[in-house]
Swiss-Prot record:
Gene3D superfamilies given in the database record: 3.40.47.10
Annotated metabolic or biological route of this protein: Secondary metabolite biosynthesis; flavonoid biosynthesis
Alphabetical list of PROSITE patterns matching this protein: CHALCONE_SYNTH
GO biological process: flavonoid biosynthetic process; polyketide biosynthetic process
Catalytic site: 164
SUPFAM superfamilies linked: Thiolase-like
Lineage: Eukaryota, Viridiplantae, Streptophyta, Embryophyta, Tracheophyta
Molecular functions (GO terms): acyltransferase activity, transferring groups other than amino-acyl groups; naringenin-chalcone synthase activity
Enzyme Commission number: 2.3.1.74
Gene: CHS3
Pfam families: Chal_sti_synt_C (PF02797), Chal_sti_synt_N (PF00195)
UniProt keyword terms in alphabetical order: Acyltransferase, Flavonoid biosynthesis, Transferase
Protein name per its UniProtKB record: Chalcone synthase 3
Keyword Acyltransferase on entry: yes
Length: 388
């Protein structure tokens, strides 16, 4: 007869959760940011709004984005004029697209991660799927299980409508699953498609235009597990996680799903709120490790927009190279909501290895991953790099 304590001990992994593989994917349609304002105002039949177009051009110029990838192309938009209006009933048209395309793009990223991991997919015990693009039952987690041919007994977690902080949320959840279930291998997938948020311009809601200038499509997948086998290659350890709602930030970022699709509202000084509270989050995370110099750690921050990164840098006195991987992803892909931080994780380990920097985290041992989004919610993940 075994005790409950013995059962519990047998269930737990010994070491910390570890990221073992990363895969990313985008739709084939690539959009150049410099020509996007002309295209956007033409496709939405808004060319008469000349002043607004100039404002939008300035937004795109200041965005620090070179290009983005979008499932929505000219052909699809011409077939779905309701999606091009600012406020037309269009949810059915949007749902028809994303319910199919979100799991499909997720599959592409997951297939790359599984290939890098090098283990049979039958060893995947848990699946976390995260998207802010569309809602369905059974969900995108079920569709991906079918698309990949995972075991029917895989334990699934579906996270809908979390928003831009959720790249941190999925790692927090994956850590808890991996460390509390011996031998667990968690497939994490974030897949985002802007077909649910795309809409024409209006001069009454400029915050809607900000989203049109920043958002792009992408999917990222990671495999997380504890106690790596000799055949598995650890990339980063997930050491500590936290989630918090910032004080006095209610209504700072809102998203509402309705007949017109998903509408976003930025109501307060988001960069200011984040930069004002970032140090508190870092102290809580790094004081136990005796780290107070935030230039001595590597950085992965959700690139909500350039102003957030600029103000965080200024507040903490960060060297420009600290945000290099983050700014690279913003420049090459735009803001892909929950998938962004996983793209940055991928970029960082690739560049670190290419440049012979000694660890997956730019030659440094410790790092931080931040997610920022609706709430205002902040996710903090303390990472430990792996020697390469």
């Amino acid at each position: 007869m075994v005790s409950v304590e013995e059962i519990r001990n047998a269930q737990r992994a010994e070491g910390p959760a570890t990221v073992m593989a990363i895969g990313t994917a985008t739709p084939p349609n690539c959009v150049d940011q410099s020509t996007y304002p002309d295209y956007y105002f033409r496709i939405t039949n808004s060319e008469h709004m000349t002043e607004l177009k100039e404002k939008f051009k300035r937004m795109c110029d200041k965005s620090m984005i070179k290009k983005r990838y979008m499932y929505l192309n000219e052909e699809i938009l011409k077939e779905n004029p309701s999606v091009c209006a600012y406020m037309a009933p269009s949810l059915d048209a949007r749902q028809d697209m994303v319910v199919v395309e979100v799991p499909k793009l997720g599959k592409e990223a997951a297939t790359k991660a599984i290939k890098e991991w090098g283990q049979p997919k039958s060893k995947i015990t848990h699946l976390i799927f995260c998207t802010t693009s569309g809602v369905d039952m059974p969900g995108a987690d079920y569709q991906l299980t079918k698309l990949l041919g995972l075991r029917p007994s895989v334990k699934r977690y579906m996270m809908y409508q979390q928003g831009c902080f959720a790249g941190g949320t999925v790692l927090r959840l994956a850590k808890d699953l991996a460390e509390n279930n011996k031998g667990a291998r968690v497939l994490v997938v974030c897949s985002e498609i802007t077909a649910v948020t795309f809409r024409g311009p209006t001069d009454t809601h400029l915050d809607s235009l900000v989203g049109q200038a920043l958002f792009g499509d992408g999917a990222a997948a990671v495999i997380v597990g504890s106690d790596p086998l000799p055949v598995e290659k650890p990339l980063f350890q997930l050491v500590w996680t936290a989630q918090t709602i910032l004080p006095d930030s209610e209504g700072a970022i809102d998203g509402h799903l309705g007949e017109v699709g998903l509408t976003f509202h930025l109501l307060k000084d988001v960069p200011g709120l984040i930069s004002k509270n970032i140090e508190k989050a870092l102290v809580e995370a790094f004081q136990p490790l005796g780290i107070s110099d935030y230039n001595s750690i590597f950085w992965i921050a959700h690139p909500g927009g350039p102003a957030i990164l600029d103000q965080v840098e200024a507040k903490l006195g960060l060297k420009p190279e600290k945000m290099e991987a983050t700014r690279h992803v913003l420049s090459e892909y735009g803001n892909m909501s929950s998938a962004c931080v996983l793209f940055i994780l991928d970029q960082m380990r690739k560049k670190s290895i290419e440049n012979g920097l000694g660890t997956t985290g730019e030659g440094l041992d410790w790092g931080v991953l931040f997610g920022f989004g609706p709430g205002l919610t902040v996710e903090t993940v303390v990472l430990r790099s792996v020697t390469v």
